[in-house]
Amino acid sequence: VHLTDAEKAAISGLWGKVNADGVGAEALGRLLVVYPWTQRFFEHFGDLSSSSAVMGNAKVKSHGKKVITAFADGLKHLDNLKGTFSALSELHCDKLHVDPENFKLLGNMIVIVLSHDLGKDFTPDAQSAFQKVVTGVATALGHKYH
C-alpha cells in the first residue's frame, strides 16, 4: 500500500482515538448481519438468527477483538502488509477456506464503523487513507489464494 506521510499520520492519529475492541466487534457483527452468507464460518458461535442476536453475541465480540488486533498490528507495518498477514492468509486459505472477497467486505465494515465512531474527524481524506489500508489488508489476506 502506498501511503503519503500525511496519510500515515492521519491513520495513526485517528486510530488512537477509537476503542479498537469496539470497532472490531461492531465491524464483524455488521459483516455477519449485512452479508449473512458469511455466517457459515461462524456457525459454532451460537445464535446468529437476528441482528440483535449477532450484535450481542459474546463470541462475535471476542472474535471481532482478535480481528481488530490483527488489523492494528498491520497499521504498525503498513510497508509490509503481505508479510504481516502471511500466516493469517495461509490459515484462512488452506484451513478455513474463506472466500477472499469477504476480507474486502470486512474492510468496508471497518471503514463504516470508523466513520460512525470518529464523526467529523473522519474526513474524506481520512476515509481515503483508511480505505487504502483496508484494501491493502484484504489483498494481503488473499495473497495465499493466488
From Swiss-Prot:
Give the sites modified to N-acetylvaline. Answer: 1
Species of the source: Ondatra zibethicus
- Residues annotated as carrying N6-acetyllysine in the record are 59, 82, 144
Locate the Globin domain: which residues? 2-146
Q: What does this protein do?
A: Involved in oxygen transport from the lung to the various peripheral tissues.
Q: In which tissues is it expressed?
A: Red blood cells.
Q: What is this protein called?
A: Hemoglobin subunit beta
The record's Pfam families line, in alphabetical order, gives: Globin
| Similarity-based family | Belongs to the globin family.
Q: Cite the entry's keywords alphabetically.
A: Acetylation, Heme, Iron, Metal-binding, Oxygen transport, S-nitrosylation, Transport
Its GO biological process annotations read: hydrogen peroxide catabolic process
> Between which residues do disulfide bridges form?
none
Q: Does the keyword Metal-binding apply?
A: yes
Describe the subunit structure.
Heterotetramer of two alpha chains and two beta chains.
Instruction: Fetch the InterPro entries from UniProt.
Output: Globin, Globin-like_sf, Globin/Proto, Hemoglobin_b, Hemoglobin_oxygen_transport
